[in-house]
Amino acid sequence: MRKLTFISMLVLISVLLSACGSAATPAATTSAKPVNIKFETNPNPAMKSDLELILTITDANGQPIEGATVDVAVDHTDMTGMGMSGLATEQGDGRYAITADFSDSGNWLLTVYVRKEGLDYKEEIEFTVQ
């Protein structure tokens, strides 16, 4: 009887261990984004003043995205209520720009929305105004 109990326990432990172990391999994830945004400011580095935000927007293959609607919003991350938004104007070759008055230094969060023919992309970019 003891032998039967021992064997039953061994079988039970084996079943539990094989149920807990996963033989499935995780699905491959791709890190390629459908849109790449290169962000720069004029002047550079960003200073308290009228600041031009320049966005170079390309697809996953590095080709410029032209004719898109590019909405931008900026929020001061250290001060609630300090934000602005607007539509960037196309400059050609995938470049878009908007000018805003940054009267306060500190940390800012730029949210960029790119929309064009089935493409609806959002990216957040942190930057500092000196």
Predicted regions and their residues:
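Bacterial signal peptide processing site
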Residues: 21-24
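Aromatic sugar-binding surface patches on proteins
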Residues: 90-97
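Beta-strand-rich structural segments
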Residues: 49-61
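A short beta-turn/strand-edge loop motif at beta-sheet boundaries
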Residues: 47, 62-67
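Edge beta-strands of extracellular beta-sandwich domains
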Residues: 122-128
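Residue-level recognition of secondary-structure-to-loop junctions
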Residues: 90, 102-104
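Short amphipathic beta-strand segments in non-cytosolic proteins
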Residues: 71-87
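C-terminal motif of bacterial Sec signal peptides marking the signal peptidase cleavage site
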Residues: 15-19
